[in-house]
């Protein structure tokens, strides 16, 4: 049975006991409203560790002033049942006061330069600063051997890996594959914001990513591929933030060179819902 923990001292006691037994510990950080994509991360963690802690914390410092912090879906009972079903050992539910004892305005903040400034960083200033700050705190609270993050938030994964290297956290970072609906739409907690009419339209993002990958692998000029992707998404009713081809480290590729490993990334709005997705190749 899953152990739900809200006290930091108790969490540290549990983890210390596991350590005394020589057990490996994994952390799966989440913001709740969990779906099959999240649960796949827990199952991946179980392959690499003896015990799994999953945190649920809707982190206020990674939301911008006009984003959906207040209305972000919170489903604690369903989250607990789902985590228990996939073998999570501890559900860590910290309060805002536990995570930010001095308040969110006075807290120490972490920032990873360069990779945090592009793509999502352009459209969501301060987002990765909030992500790095809360993830570093979770690392210090749980002291895991391994931590698992979803590849749907690909830039977040790259940023966290850089932070771990720069700050010498002795933690292995794993990326879990994107879990998709039957029509290719990447599973996301924000999909529930889509109307019945918008839901079929949303799958066009994945089809566009496939077209981008195929065009690049056939020798297409990256700027042309990106421009066509924007046209395609706009024709499907999206307001596009970006549709780009990048190297796997998010560096910009050189035209005329077929890159592998590479990645196509899209962020676009359908009505009031902002969706992100990517496709590695």
Swiss-Prot record:
It is found in: Cytoplasm. It catalyses: (R)-pantoate + beta-alanine + ATP = (R)-pantothenate + AMP + diphosphate + H(+). ATP binds at residues 31-38, 150-153, 179, 187-190. The active site is at residue 38. Beta-alanine binds at residue 62. Coiled coil: none annotated. Its EC number is 6.3.2.1. Keywords: ATP-binding, Cytoplasm, Ligase, Nucleotide-binding, Pantothenate biosynthesis. GO terms for biological process: pantothenate biosynthetic process. Pfam families: Pantoate_ligase. InterPro entries: Pantoate_ligase, Pantoate_ligase_C, Rossmann-like_a/b/a_fold. Homodimer. Belongs to the pantothenate synthetase family. This is Pantothenate synthetase. It comes from Xylella fastidiosa (strain M12).
């Amino acid at each position: 049975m899953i152990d739900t923990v809200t006290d930091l001292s108790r969490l540290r006691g549990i983890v210390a006991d596991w350590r005394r037994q020589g057990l490996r510990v994994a952390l799966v950080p989440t913001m709740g409203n969990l779906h099959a994509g999240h649960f796949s991360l827990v199952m991946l963690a179980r392959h690499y560790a003896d015990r799994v802690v999953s945190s649920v914390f809707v982190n206020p410092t990674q939301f911008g002033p006009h984003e959906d912090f207040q209305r972000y879906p919170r489903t604690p009972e369903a989250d607990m049942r789902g985590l228990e079903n996939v073998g999570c050992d501890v559900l860590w539910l910290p309060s805002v006061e536990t995570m930010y004892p001095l308040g969110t305005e006075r807290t120490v903040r972490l920032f990873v330069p360069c990779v945090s400034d592009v793509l999502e960083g352009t459209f969501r200033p301060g987002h990765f600063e909030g992500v790095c700050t809360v993830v570093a705190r979770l690392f210090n609270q749980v002291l895991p051997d391994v931590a698992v993050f979803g590849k749907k938030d690909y830039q977040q994964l790259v940023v966290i890996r850089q932070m771990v290297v720069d700050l010498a956290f002795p933690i292995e970072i794993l990326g879990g594959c994107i879990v998709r609906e039957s029509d290719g739409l990447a599973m996301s907690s924000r999909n529930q914001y889509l109307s019945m009419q918008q839901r079929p339209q949303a799958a066009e993002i994945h089809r566009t990513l496939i077209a981008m990958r195929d065009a690049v692998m056939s020798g297409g000029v990256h700027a042309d591929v990106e421009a066509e992707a924007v046209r395609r998404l706009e024709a499907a009713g999206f307001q596009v933030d970006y549709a780009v081809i990048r190297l796997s480290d998010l560096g910009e590729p050189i035209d005329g060179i077929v890159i592998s490993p590479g990645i196509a990334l899209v962020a676009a709005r359908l009505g009031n819902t902002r969706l992100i997705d990517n496709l590695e190749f």
